[in-house]
Amino acid sequence: MISCGGKRILRRNDGEEGSLPVSDELEVLQSVTARLEGANIPYMVTGSMAANFYAVPRMTRDIDLVIELSDRDVDRVTRLFQVEYYIDRDMVQRAVRDHAMFNMIHNAMVVKVDCVVRKETEYRREEFARRRAVSVAGQRIFIVSPEDLILSKLDWAKESRSQMQLDDVRNLLRSVQRLDTEYLNRWADRLGLIELYQEVCQ
């Protein structure tokens, strides 16, 4: 079993306190997640914004979310954001149908929010179940676990060999002090990411 980037831990630490740089992106993130919470729409923050929570921040202009949506949520989500955001109902509907991505843009701040409709695979269900409730600027926000963020970034880097994604993984491995290495090894192997995981651990 590969072990790198911290001690093994077998449970989550919900309610974790953290911070993100004050920015338009943070303001939009708080606005979007508060609306989703108010509408009882399950979500989690992922991508660069999540990496900035767990590790040394880098500049990002986009916000990435995974959302649980069904056909009956299409109109509700569109109405929820259509006043302050550019959002296309047809794009939302296609994303729900195909378990794909739609995006919306804050009209005033021009911050883009990419929303991926959660896929119905075993891993994506487990990843979503492991999301963490954290406090950012006094607001509860659900965020991907650091282990699943590492796996996602390895997956994104697998085909593209993106150095930025691999650097993000190394940053996370250095910064997060308690990682479930058993979980990381198991899913890296099952997802065909074990060689890339070994590479970043060297």
Model-identified regions with their sequence ranges:
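Compositionally biased terminal segments of proteins
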Residues: 2-202
